[in-house]
A protein has these predicted regions:
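Bacterial N-terminal signal peptides that target proteins for export
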Residues: 1-10
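Eukaryotic intrinsically disordered, low-complexity regulatory linkers and tails enriched in Ser/Thr/Pro
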Residues: 23-211
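Bacterial N-terminal signal peptides
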Residues: 9-18
Length: 211
């Protein structure tokens, strides 16, 4: 990497670190990230059909924070853990042969077909620096992640298998999915299954809904 690229990368990292420290807009109250009994019943109803919506789509329809919807998914459709599990989960995603990374910003959605880059914590800040050997790179703030949820369910456009990362806004920061296909390669499904199995070795973030 040349000197100009290094300077640009360093500047970007500094800006991201400052932005991360200022992150406090509209957090969801710590005790309100799991559904109560009434909310759980509404979420179960939203996921009772033949196809399941993405959590952010169900959240908009139900008028609930997305992280609450994710926390209320029936056990057969997913598993959620505390955000402190980031490094173990991200390392597992790095073993996937291929992925689609979904990033939402307001009403906009970016989808990047890429191998999930590995990375390591910065020695100078709270950033987790992604490697530069994939189509996607960047700098994450895993200390701000409050929840990680895997979902596996039949969707309107095919079976979805993915992992969402949430912060205290109650919205997903990003999602990592098995690329959509009528019959995805067995290696991709197996890689997702390993990540899901890892998540299931950890305590669930919310009480397990039935189903």
């Amino acid at each position: 990497m040349n000197r100009s690229s290094l300077a640009t990368t360093s500047l970007l990292a500094c800006l991201l670190a400052v932005a991360g420290e200022a992150h406090a807009a509209g957090p969801v109250a710590a005790g309100a990230t799991c559904p109560d009994a009434s909310q759980a019943a509404r979420i179960a109803s939203a996921y009772a059909g033949a196809t399941a919506p993405m959590p952010f789509m169900a959240a908009a329809k139900l008028g609930l924070p997305e992280v609450v919807v994710a926390g209320g998914l029936p056990a057969a459709l997913g598993h959620g853990v505390d955000g402190k599990a980031f490094q173990a989960v991200w390392q597992s995603l790095g073993a996937w042969p291929d992925a689609v990374v979904m990033i939402r910003k307001g009403a906009n959605i970016f989808e990047i077909r890429t191998r999930v880059p590995t990375g390591k914590p910065s020695t100078r800040s709270k950033l987790f620096n992604l490697d530069h050997d994939a189509a996607l790179s960047g700098h994450l703030r895993p200390d701000l992640f409050t929840a990680i949820h895997a979902i596996q369910a039949p969707g309107a456009e095919g079976f979805m298998r993915g992992v969402f990362f949430y912060d205290d806004s109650g919205e997903s920061v990003l999602g990592v999915f098995v690329p959509p296909a009528e019959a995805p390669p067995a290696a991709q499904v197996a890689a997702f299954d390993k990540t899901l199995a890892l998540l299931k070795t950890l305590p669930p973030r919310c009480p397990r809904p039935a189903g």
